[in-house]
């Protein structure tokens, strides 16, 4: 599995990348592999508030559906609209083209409370 060291991770299998004052998030390579081929991604609405650990969206595969949890609290400022037509981007490139949404976090320091890649992989 590929879990880049520069990212942070939630125990619920989401990854986080800081980009300026925003946080980009998606599901991990492990999560997409377990789910199988994705057929639908339900993103949160732009402008909505998300709470760390709470459901922010859903991914559906040919096998099952799974909640996407917010890794940090904040306001959703952008969603990856490319996933509407190509949810398989999450399978093909979970840390790149398969990002799901961007958050303006209430407190950017909350990202540091998330797991390193080594901590995340140890919990798999």
Swiss-Prot record:
Residues 22-104 form the Lipoyl-binding domain. It comes from the Bacteria. Binds 1 lipoyl cofactor covalently. Its cofactor is (R)-lipoate. Keywords: Lipoyl. GO terms for biological process: glycine decarboxylation via glycine cleavage system. CDD domains: GCS_H. InterPro entries: 2-oxoA_DH_lipoyl-BS (IPR003016), Biotin_lipoyl (IPR000089), GCV_H (IPR002930), GCV_H/Fam206 (IPR033753), GCV_H_sub (IPR017453), Single_hybrid_motif (IPR011053). The modification N6-lipoyllysine is found at residue 63. One of its GO terms (cellular component) is cytosol. The glycine cleavage system is composed of four proteins: P, T, L and H. The glycine cleavage system catalyzes the degradation of glycine. The H protein shuttles the methylamine group of glycine from the P protein to the T protein. Belongs to the GcvH family. This is Glycine cleavage system H protein. It comes from Acinetobacter baumannii (strain ATCC 17978 / DSM 105126 / CIP 53.77 / LMG 1025 / NCDC KC755 / 5377). The lineage of its organism: Bacteria, Pseudomonadati, Pseudomonadota, Gammaproteobacteria, Moraxellales.
